[in-house]
Amino acid sequence: PLSEYEGPGRANAGRQVFVFGDTFIGRVDPATGARRDFDMVYNTLAYLDGGQPDAERIQFVWGKNGSRQLRSPQVGKDAVFLPSTRQAQGAGTCWYWLQDGLALADHMYLMPMLVRRDPAGPPGFQFADFGVCLLKIPIAGNGLDLARHAQIDAPFFHCDDARKLYFGAAFMPNTSAAGA
């Protein structure tokens, strides 16, 4: 919620933000369920006014800075957030998979995984995660000021021969404003 309140009972009074990783944007054949004329975008957002599912009260956001424009025939290039951190530089084609986030004071913070192409992966899974970043997005008016977001490499990913460790998923604010 943009209001910061994470406890029960107030969702109907505010605006919620949903974050998505891979998203298909396009049309679906109603008879077959097959996707037609679509683009796959690596990260998108949605705003929902109130706390109940309602197609009239949800707005999906994609494209650079939330422009809602599909501007590239390349898969994934129409994401809201395109990696620009030091860790992303030189990594080849990479993207963010949005994970968890929270609103705190006048910013929303997201902890996306940094992912790149990996041709050695099995069919359909030619990607590998290689980092975690922090996105800091100003809250302005009734939404996010996506054009003014900041990206920071976060030291919350560790990989060795035995395992991968990620931090930054399923975190919640422990503040009175959040209902704690």
Where are these regions (language model features)?
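Carbohydrate-active catalytic/glycan-binding domains of CAZyme proteins
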Residues: 1-180
